[in-house]
């Protein structure tokens, strides 16, 4: 059994990868970096620890300028538009950030430029003449993402100049076969220019020593170590007019900005400063604080090698404690594609099935180790079975029975039987497993623990037949309902990080006092006599017709025929 991965401190800085402000959020984003981080942070807070969840939109780089070009608007207009959209998407999904910032804010520019200057003063940068692709047709040097070509490693013909999306390898534009402009498709030529390089190779030994003892997900650690083996210095400036200006008087710095993957992770620091101007150092400089970065696997190299190297070079900040990266989420056997519109967007999913169903369904497919396929039919059928039929039904039958047979007051128990003790022992075992799994980032196993406990409590209730006991053995009926109420309280604590909105409604129906996780998962004798409220049904099933409609929608999108808003409006919205 894996050890409980829970550092002996009480201060945690949790971050989710900063989403590019160039489009809305889809289920792949949610499953990879945002829902797992939200579940994890909610649990830490429930445990009573000082934990903050920091995020914000990444608003620089060629991903932004390219998207703005395609939409026919300025980069500023684009990021303003999508910052608001992304923030709303997260709110709809119940993703709760303590602070959600932007990398175009003044505090971020100041923090990034100070960071750059410190590394510059310490000798970690070197100005080099390099040959870079120039587009005669467009009359300018092209940054890496403005260049596409064939990946030299896997042969993917649409690889970007910075990374191949298919095999995940980091690339330099000059490595591409048959490079061309991503905008015009025109051929390119190499010309000489100047850029500042981060001397990553000088930190190779430090990175290896730091990484070798890390108790991380195996695939994350292996990826990082393999990348460090072949580490090379990287240019951290770009020829762009959108971004954080290089803060040097050098004439060669004119018209250059910081590479987006240099300034973006500094956004974690600037957002924390913005949120807690008087306490931010408690999270970034106190060696007892733990920083945990939730990301997708395409960002592993940046968060496990380049970002730690930047922090090492700076010398004043904590290094990441853990980087629980997740793999990719596929959809109905196909790769998600925002450009082709093949995705399920956060807002349409919540508007269709509600926040709780959406969160639960996505959590079932968090790609913790390998790329995972989200099957919409299976997802909704499992959610119906596990969340609605098991947990939701348990809550309804226990509270309804107390209201109907005990005047809405939790009965006082009598002596426990061996069957009662067996249930309590099973509860204790499941709670321990759940906590261990969740804190080791095994979110799907923790979710399974919650469901299995819910099923066991349902069986206990069903087999005791309280509707007969209340007539034939009232004292025994009181004990069964007291224990059922207590068990419902306990299992609700396990479901809380996954479906917080509905669980908080349940706690209100149960008239439970505020408390921490450790309080919730214990039997509380003082709740005997507690007056509960009239309860309402927590969840509604996703009906077969709606499941079929979703399958049809995705089949159309898979055929590169993005469904129109008129077609989508035909889907019944029942929340």
Regions found by a protein language model. Give the residues of each.
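Active-site-proximal binding-pocket segments
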Residues: 300, 365, 369, 378, ...
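N-terminal, positively charged nucleic-acid-binding surface of large information/translation enzymes
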Residues: 2-209
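Alpha-helical scaffold segments in carbohydrate-active enzymes
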Residues: 111-118, 264-267, 390-401, 426, ...
């Amino acid at each position: 059994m894996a050890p409980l991965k829970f550092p002996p401190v009480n201060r945690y800085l949790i971050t989710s990868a900063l989403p590019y402000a160039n489009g809305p959020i889809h289920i792949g984003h949610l499953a990879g970096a945002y829902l797992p981080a939200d579940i994890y942070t909610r649990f830490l807070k429930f445990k009573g620890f000082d934990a903050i969840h920091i995020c914000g939109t990444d608003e620089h780089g060629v991903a932004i300028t390219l998207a703005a070009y395609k939409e026919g608007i300025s980069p500023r207009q684009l990021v303003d538009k999508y910052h608001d959209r992304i923030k709303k998407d997260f709110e709809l999904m119940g993703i709760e950030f303590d602070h959600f910032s932007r990398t175009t804010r003044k505090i971020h520019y100041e923090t990034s430029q100070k960071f750059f200057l410190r590394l510059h003063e310490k000798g970690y940068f070197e100005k080099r003449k390099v040959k870079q692709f120039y587009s005669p047709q467009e009359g300018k040097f092209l940054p890496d993402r403005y260049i596409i070509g064939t990946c030299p490693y896997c042969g993917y013909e649409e690889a970007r100049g910075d990374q191949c999306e298919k095999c995940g390898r980091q690339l330099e534009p000059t490595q591409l076969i048959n490079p061309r402009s991503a905008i015009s498709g025109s051929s390119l030529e190499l010309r000489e220019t100047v850029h500042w390089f981060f001397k990553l190779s000088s930190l190779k030994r430090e990175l290896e020593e730091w990484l070798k003892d890390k108790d991380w997900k195996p695939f994350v650690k292996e990826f990082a170590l393999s990348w460090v083996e072949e580490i090379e210095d990287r240019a951290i400036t770009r020829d762009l007019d959108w971004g954080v200006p290089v803060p040097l008087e050098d004439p060669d710095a004119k018209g250059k900005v910081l590479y987006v993957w240099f300034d973006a992770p500094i956004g974690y620091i600037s957002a924390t400063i913005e949120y807690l101007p008087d306490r931010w150092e408690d999270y970034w400089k106190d060696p007892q604080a733990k920083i945990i970065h939730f990301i997708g696997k395409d960002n592993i190299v940046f968060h496990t090698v380049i970002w730690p190297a930047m922090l090492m070079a700076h010398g004043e900040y904590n290094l990441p404690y853990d980087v629980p990266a997740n793999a990719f989420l596929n959809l109905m056997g196909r790769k998600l594609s925002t450009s082709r519109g093949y995705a399920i967007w956060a807002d349409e999913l919540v508007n269709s099935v509600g926040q709780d169903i959406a969160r639960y369904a996505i959590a079932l497919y968090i790609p913790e180790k390998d790329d995972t396929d989200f099957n919409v039919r299976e997802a909704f059928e499992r959610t119906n079975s596990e969340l609605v039929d098991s947990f939701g039904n348990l809550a309804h039958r226990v509270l309804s029975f107390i209201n109907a047979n005990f005047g809405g007051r939790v009965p006082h128990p009598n002596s426990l039987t061996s069957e009662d003790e067996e249930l309590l022992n099973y509860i204790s075992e499941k709670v321990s497993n759940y906590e261990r799994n969740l804190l080791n980032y095994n979110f799907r196993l923790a979710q399974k623990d919650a469901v299995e406990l819910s099923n066991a409590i349902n069986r206990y209730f069903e087999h005791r037949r309280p509707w007969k006991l209340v007539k034939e053995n009232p004292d025994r009926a009181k004990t069964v309902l007291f224990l059922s109420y207590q068990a419902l309280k306990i299992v609700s604590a396990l479901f809380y990080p996954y479906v917080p909105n509905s669980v908080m409604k349940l706690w209100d129906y149960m008239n439970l006092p505020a408390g921490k996780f450790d309080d919730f998962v214990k039997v509380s004798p003082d709740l005997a006599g507690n007056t509960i409220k009239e309860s309402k049904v927590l969840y509604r099933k996703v009906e077969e017709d709606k499941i079929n409609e979703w399958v049809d929608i995705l089949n159309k999108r898979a055929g590169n025929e993005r469904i129109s808003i008129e077609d989508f409006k035909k889907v019944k919205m029942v929340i």
